[in-house]
């Protein structure tokens, strides 16, 4: 937090609400540079960008299961969609996750096996009611942006898609000189999905790690109720471990929203759905980078990349106009 404040990268004071960071120009530049860098890479890897709303009617959260199983971590409110004379109150929920929006986008179209895999990504801001004692600067906030993506694919495509995601993880982590380790969390006692689905999904995650020559630990019974997952934990410059990337198989949402695709035999099947985040929370990753580099970010990611010392006042306007025209961020 001291590094963030002293370098003018962010405001994590409580006047705007606990866990709701503000970003002045320098901090916003770093966030945008991270997003643009990842966006170019994702386009090259066959992802398509989407934008989804911050709020949904509560019916969406009831269908997804969040209303019953995650409501203590959500923000709900009512608005009058009628008139003063004939009020009609409608409850909405602020999104804690981007998944339902991507699922609704998938459901809005008819899909063939030829369309799969479909890779949708978004830099989506989410809000979670974390306990005030658990909030910690940028590393654990109540409002944060995730580099969320959801891959809709066939059962036979799962391994290849997870391998591709792990390749992306490796590229990102090596760019920032992070060492990292993987952990596969398996089926908990309470879960949905058949034994066959869980076995296939868990084996797919293991096979993907093996094909990527990525060692992993097994965290027995710590998967989500809707599917197994791979967690990527990074080590910073002084050896501290941070949770970042996640690859999650989701049996829940395709079932709840009744997603389908048309097979080569002209029958309907449920797609498999992979949730993945590379940075995780961009704010959290930003905070980890600041800690990792002790505030001295790589040049390409630095909020100010050029500083000019004018010899005379008349040089200021000329220098400013010329460099701004070339989209150069500078201090004069």
Predicted regions and their residues:
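Class II aminoacyl-tRNA synthetase-like tRNA-binding/catalytic domains
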Residues: 11-138, 221-223, 229-246, 254
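Flexible, glycine/charged-enriched surface loops at secondary-structure junctions
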Residues: 5, 48-53, 176-181, 216-219, ...
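Conserved alpha/beta enzyme-core scaffolds, especially Rossmann-like or related mixed alpha/beta domains
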Residues: 11-25, 140-196, 220, 300-305, ...
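Single conserved hydrophobic/aromatic residue that forms the stacking wall/gate
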Residues: 2-9, 13, 322-325, 329-332
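Short flexible coil/turn linkers enriched for glycine and charged/polar residues
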Residues: 16, 143, 176-178, 224-226, ...
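Generic long, charged, amphipathic alpha-helical segments
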Residues: 296-324, 330
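Metal-assisted phosphate- and nucleotidyl-transfer catalytic regions
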Residues: 79, 83, 174-247
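Conserved alpha/beta core surface patches that mediate binding of polyanionic ligands
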Residues: 1, 5-7, 96-151, 155-172, ...
